[in-house]
Amino acid sequence: MAKEINTIGVLTSGGDAPGMNAAIRAVVRQALSKGKKVKGIKRGYAGLLNEEIVDMDSKSVSDTISRGGTILQTARCKEFVTAEGQQKGAEICKKHGIDAIVVIGGDGSFQGAQKLAALGINTIGLPGTIDLDIACTDYTIGFDTACNTAMEAIDKVRDTSTSHERCSIIEVMGRGAGYIALWCGLANGAEEILLPEKYDNSLKALIERVAHARGLGKQHYIIINAEGVGHSQEMAKEIEAATGIETRATILGHMQRGGSPSCKDRVYATIMGAMAVDLLCEGKSNRVIAHKDGNFVDFDIDEALAMKKSVAEYMYDISKSLV
């Protein structure tokens, strides 16, 4: 017999991503429409362990759909990685009458949800990360906005790079995954895209390509560098020293996490948030919602975490042929 759900908790965990507020709003209002109570858990799993738990109603999420960041705040929590921390979290949920939790975050957040599910707290995960590095889904909340933010910034860097006939290295977020770099590289028509999944650490070869392009008459050169490759400032110095071409590095940093979410992030996050509540009301647990092959679907968290993600090879190939 399915466990009856009366009160649903919602939290955001790990790095913030534009669209998280749209997801929170959808969870709250969809739950209320089904006669459920909602409690917001502030600062992720750290807030759960500290019992930073607040009642939420429709007004709690008014005028939040267009806001970046997360109204519940977020944090990373080492204590929750331990079995003791997880047990404490489950007991706190029961103490506050929380039957189920919607967890918005990445793979690490899903691992926490997985542990809570095993301890009797029904959980649904929503993919919230600007990095698009969750294998079970083609879309993650915040990726679209982050790409648009980076793309617009890179356009501006290209303007000045063209004026000064420079080589410009623009570093975007993505420690273990180069999806922002790949998408922006194509969107901005970059001459070079450096991905952690593909970079061979051959700075000499990169310098040769920059020099060769200048020899062919190319007056500026845009390199999009994922932070997982990094060392942008050092690369710029090496390129300039070897070629004589003025080279500057720009690190976009945390601006990619901020800003009002795009239409796509608002709509997809809303659908995912509502779907999470629907699944919980059906008695489902230990699931993660994904957008796969054009459809919103759900996977067992264990299955989702076991999946591996690879770079879209065709996108990477054409990024080189279209230079």
What is the predicted role of each segment?
Residues 13-16, 36, 41-46, 76-77, ...:
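Short, ordered loop/turn segments at secondary-structure junctions
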Residues 38, 103-105, 115, 122, ...:
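Accessory alpha-helical/coil subdomains and C-terminal extensions
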Residues 136-146, 260-266:
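Short beta-strand elements at the ligand-binding edges of bilobed clamshell
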Residues 231-234, 239-323:
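C-terminal non-catalytic interaction/assembly regions of soluble proteins
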Residues 2, 48-101, 108-109, 141-148, ...:
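Glycine-rich oxoanion-binding loops at beta->alpha junctions
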Residues 22-27, 108-121, 181:
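Short Gly/Thr/Asp-enriched flexible loops that form oxyanion-binding sites at enzyme active sites
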